[in-house]
Amino acid sequence: MLAAVSDHALSEATMGAYVAQEMATGALSAAQGALAQLLGMPDEGVAFVESATVALGTLLDVWPFGAEPSIGVVPSEWGPNLAAFSRRGLRIVELPVDDDGYVDLAGLERVLASSPPSAVHITQVASHRSLVQPVAAIAGVCHAAAVPLFVDAAQALGHVDTATGAAVVYATSRKWLTGPRGVGVLAVASAWFPGLRRVLEVLEPEAPEEPIGALLSSRESHVAGRIGLGHAAREHLSLGPPAVWQRLAAVGRATRQLLQDLDNWQVVGPVDDASAISALRPTAGQDVMAVRARLLGELGIVTTAQHVFRAPREMRGPTLRVSPHVDTTSDDLVRLRDALGSR
């Protein structure tokens, strides 16, 4: 991946950006195809943008919501997404969940039958704690009710199965696929192409007759990063995604099992969840920013100090996030436990 990114950057420097991009048409098509496979979408529905944030903004700008638009969310929804909905005037409809925060499928069926929102939006893998939503089942409920499902797969792509049957999936390159920064992806199912094309024809009447993915893609772009994301996606496919997902789930469970008996810390979220992400709530007044700084500065252990803005409808105070990847060992986890228990 690094070689592909640097090779394209060198091509831009020696031949010019436009010529280099033309010469990279095959690599970009391959990237689109690999991502389409991971997301369960048609190649022509895959758009490249700068980030998951830009992807959501693009989606909200072009989706044909109609009058009095609303969007269904769960309490664990990512805070910046909620802000994006608010800026665009979408009324928030809170969807039912169980005690652990998973969508209550029967409750969702009732909501969609009685007072359906314009769309349902689900963050598939929560950023702030262990919580992987049953998105394939949610997609089935939404499809039966003819309500589009939007999926934020920023923490899901490369982490869990993202080919779920949703109307729209968007993600970023730089998380579990470990692709380049500055690249995101927005993918739309073909059933929704006609409605989007009608909106795009109004917004850009002079736009060329192109596939939906091309129309939604950012024009001024980090082409080398897109090529790098394609390489990362193909590497993931070559490893066998189910094996990667199973390994990440095992690492996450091992992390929570090891840390759940720590004094002065409480594991947030189900221990048996399939997420590799874990969160710890301080119970003795610890400053999570100071703990993060100590772990990194003294031991080289990377964690994240999380504040309430990440999930303002659910979080009640700061937490410490641990996000081990597939190469994390049991010794690494013991070292983290000992470091957290030492002060």
Predicted regions: what they are:
Residues 297-298, 308-343:
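PLP-dependent enzyme catalytic core of the Aspartate aminotransferase-like
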Residues 165-205:
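Active-site PLP attachment segment
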Residues 4-6, 207-257:
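Structural motif of enzymes handling amino- and sulfur-group chemistry
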